[in-house]
UniProtKB/Swiss-Prot annotation:
Alphabetized Gene3D superfamilies for the sequence: P-loop containing nucleotide triphosphate hydrolases (3.40.50.300)
Binding site for Mg(2+): S44, T66
Record protein name field: Probable GTP-binding protein EngB
Example of a GO cellular component annotation carried by this entry: cytosol
Keyword Phosphoprotein part of the UniProt annotation: no
Domain EngB-type G: 29-203
Keywords: Cell cycle, Cell division, GTP-binding, Magnesium, Metal-binding, Nucleotide-binding, Septation
Gene transcribed to yield this protein: engB
Length: 205
């Protein structure tokens, strides 16, 4: 058994470092899975629930709080990465442009990146920036898994309807994109997303 074959111990996650510039990233070794999404889509809450560590990724009622790339080590070789939230209107355009350049460089150049989790509020899916991020990742041949978060905010039928609509919208991208319902409140989809992450971590370099 290789060091990547067993499922990671997500509850062992520990804050590693933060980077505001590409040259501040930790060594491009091992395996990383990154989380990205619009401000207040539930990205930090998803990371906290997946690891079972309350407050691991800081949550805030003020969108746009995460302005750096934050790294969390699961072990010596595997990391979860919290990318800056986007789409917050009060962030100056210069800051937004710097964010776009940093994230684009990360997705394009980070060789240890195994997959990208795109977090979307199920009530407001596939906004323009969501689609831009998906386009970036597809162009760089990065596997994508979409979390439609806050599914508890909709009825079961409404959530399934939105799931189907988003599935239809992304079908042109083929098998590179998968998606699911998720709720940090009632833990809907927790086992499913963990299975996806573990599969990515076990994939060949």
């Amino acid at each position: 058994m290789t060091e990547f074959e067993s499922a990671p111990a997500y509850q062992e996650a520990k804050y590693l470092t933060s980077a505001a510039e590409f040259d501040q990233l930790p060594p491009d070794q091992g395996a990383e899975i990154a989380f990205i999404g619009r401000s207040n889509a539930g990205k930090s809450s998803a990371l906290n629930i997946i690891t079972g560590i309350k407050g691991l990724a800081r949550t805030s009622k003020t969108p746009g709080r995460t302005q750096m790339i934050n790294f969390f080590a699961l072990n010596e070789h595997e990391r979860l990465v919290d990318l800056p939230g986007y789409g917050y209107a009060k962030v100056p355009r210069m800051v937004q442009k710097r964010w776009e350049e940093l994230v684009d460089s990360y997705l394009k150049k980070r060789r240890c990146l195994k997959g990208l989790v795109v977090v979307m509020d199920i009530r407001h899916p596939l906004k323009e920036m969501d689609e831009d991020v998906i386009e970036w990742a597809v162009n760089y041949d990065i596997p994508i898994h979409i979390l439609l978060t806050k599914s508890d905010k909709l009825s079961q039928n409404a959530a399934k309807k939105t799931l189907g609509e988003v599935q239809t919208a992304i079908s042109a991208y083929g098998e590179k994109l998968t998606l699911q319902l998720f709720s940090s409140h009632d833990r809907t989809g927790l086992d499913e997303v963990k299975a996806v992450l573990s599969q990515w971590f076990r994939s060949e370099p």
